[in-house]
Amino acid sequence: MDIIKGIDAAQLKKDIIDFNTGDTIKVHVRIKEGTRERIQVFEGIVIKRQGGGIAETFTVRRISYGVGVERTFPVHSPKIEKIEIVKHGKVRRARIFYLRDRIGKAAFKIKERKNFK
């Protein structure tokens, strides 16, 4: 069991910023197309963060051309170049799936957290 923990510890990223559910973030993802590699930015609201250790994931939701798009990322994935926080949101739930039912501008309405560290 200690061997598995040692391998997992070697794979963990050290430079992960602290973000929570309700925050608006930009995820810079490395995408390989044939021989070329480029970085694509996916900006949206974090609706879920789950798991722990190497298996920790988060889901980001955004509206693209009137259609809701959700993407789940592993936190410690080598394909994630960096994560930027655009806005800190104030929510009272760990999973804010109620945003899926909202249409238009209401899909983005989350109060901003003023006193954050």
Curated annotation (Swiss-Prot):
Entry's Gene Ontology BP terms: translation
Gene3D superfamilies documented for this protein: 2.30.30.790
Molecular-function GO terms, alphabetical: structural constituent of ribosome
Domain of life of the source: Bacteria
Keyword Transmembrane among record annotations: no
GO terms for cellular component: cytosolic large ribosomal subunit
Coiled-coil ranges (or none): none
Keywords for the protein's UniProt record, in alphabetical order: Ribonucleoprotein, Ribosomal protein
Stored HAMAP family: Ribosomal_bL19 (MF_00402)
Family membership: Belongs to the bacterial ribosomal protein bL19 family.
Role description: This protein is located at the 30S-50S ribosomal subunit interface and may play a role in the structure and function of the aminoacyl-tRNA binding site.
NCBIfam families assigned to the protein according to its UniProt record, in alphabetical order: rplS_bact
Listed name of the protein: Large ribosomal subunit protein bL19
Organism name: Alkaliphilus metalliredigens (strain QYMF)
UniProt lineage: Bacteria, Bacillati, Bacillota, Clostridia, Peptostreptococcales
